[in-house]
Amino acid sequence: MHKIAEVEIQNDILIANKKLAKRNQRLLDKAGVFAIDFLGAVGSGKTTLIEKLIERMDYSIGVIAGDIISKFDAERIKRHKIPVVGLNTGKECHLDAHLVEHGLEDLPLDKIDLLFIENVGNLICPVDFDLGSHMRIVIISATEGDDTVQKHPLIFKEADLVIINKIDLADAVGADVDKMVDDASKINPHVKVIKTSLKDDKGIDDVIEAILEAI
């Protein structure tokens, strides 16, 4: 009986979140803002990717940076002199539409073309929680192991773009990057997969091109 009640509560939470996500997207559409949700594990390169995009893209960009406790990533991104809102999720391992709604209230949407939402570092929790973004980018690193895609199929099934980062370290950790690409393509045949080494700027232009195609 308790399990049934728990499932019903979870379903209610997801339904309510979906409604809020749609409201967020309507607000973004009205303001002419294209929003991207960046998902990936801790250390995959989400913040580095966002910084590279800020430096290279000729757009007015704002950022919502989610984290469980600290606002380290938000402070790091603020160095680029753009609007940034840091959101703490407390014990939750993902952002949700309600938190993002509050984040949007603190951003000058009339002065932003692109909104980057950096989700909490996790490959499982964020999957079911739509934020109202127009695009989902999943970034993983070769150092996480070449079975990472197989272990987390749902997040790749929902991705609009997949990035495999730190390919320069693949040999050192014994990771087969081509296998990771193949696994992602099998789970989501329509998704584009880009290999990057962000510390060397390798692949960043391909990422920008993919984003521009989606806008």
Regions found by a protein language model. Name each.
Residues I4-L39, S44, L53-H134, G145-D147, ...:
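Nucleotide-state-sensitive switch-loop elements of NTP-binding domains
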Residues H134-T143, D160-N165:
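Conserved phosphate-donor/acceptor-positioning beta-strand/loop module used by diverse small-molecule
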Residues S70-A74, T148-H152, D176-D183:
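Short, glycine/polar-rich helix-capping loops at beta-to-alpha or helix-loop-helix junctions
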Residues G132-M135, K157-D160, N188-V191:
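Short glycine-/polar-rich loops that comprise or flank the Walker A/P-loop
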Residues L169-I215:
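Canonical P-loop GTPase G-domain recognition
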